[in-house]
Amino acid sequence: MRTRAKICGITRSQDVQAAVSAGADAIGLVFFPPSPRHVSIAQAQALLQHIPAYVQVVGLFVNATADQIKSVLDCVALDVLQLHGDETPEQCQEIALQCKRRWYKAIQVKPELDVVDEVQRYQAAGASAVLLDAWHPELKGGTGHQFDWSKFPKLDIPLILAGGLTPENVVDAIQTTHAFAVDVSGGVEAAKGIKDKQLIERFMQGVQCGSAK
């Protein structure tokens, strides 16, 4: 199975073009003001002009209300919602109902977490996928850290691997976890929110190599 890839935290049109040219399946836009990768609605609208059909646009939100997300959707054509905060399964269901979008939940893999149970809770709530990310006591994603990949389960729901991925380790990551998709942000950056074209290309080459083996 071909492993999908999302380049997240894009803020510049040239980075969209680099990701698309390299073969990314999805582009992630961050709507969380504390993040250095946050984009305004105006920025997002401009970036969308460079994203072709068949490349999904994922909007990342952290503990946002349905009304806050809808205010973005009124202006920005997002395909999928990535809920990356402390949203409960019930809150995710309500957001999906009101926003009428597919969604997936990001789960930070804490040392004591029962990963299978947590994934199944969100699967039962209607998640179209679940993203497993490294845990950090203060940050919501983009930590640059990875978790113990041996904890990556095999379940009947698409699972996305995130956290500390780079061009150097993505082949091993895919072969170890057999993830449905991989999600990278800091691993392909020259600076926070500024992607590096060559790193994106090398990362996507690694994704293709890892999928083929």
Curated annotation (Swiss-Prot):
Protein name as catalogued: N-(5'-phosphoribosyl)anthranilate isomerase
Alphabetized NCBIfam families for the sequence: PRK01222.1-4 (NF002298), PRK01222.1-6 (NF002299)
Please name every pair of cysteines joined by a disulfide bond in this record: none
Record key words, sorted: Amino-acid biosynthesis, Aromatic amino acid biosynthesis, Isomerase, Tryptophan biosynthesis
Q: Does the keyword Repeat apply?
A: no
Q: What EC class is this?
A: isomerase
PANTHER family attached here? N-(5'-PHOSPHORIBOSYL)ANTHRANILATE ISOMERASE
The UniProt entry, under CDD domains, shows: PRAI
- Give the pathway annotation: Amino-acid biosynthesis; L-tryptophan biosynthesis; L-tryptophan from chorismate: step 3/5
In short, the EC number is 5.3.1.24
The reaction(s) catalysed by this protein are: N-(5-phospho-beta-D-ribosyl)anthranilate = 1-(2-carboxyphenylamino)-1-deoxy-D-ribulose 5-phosphate
UniProt organism field: Acinetobacter calcoaceticus
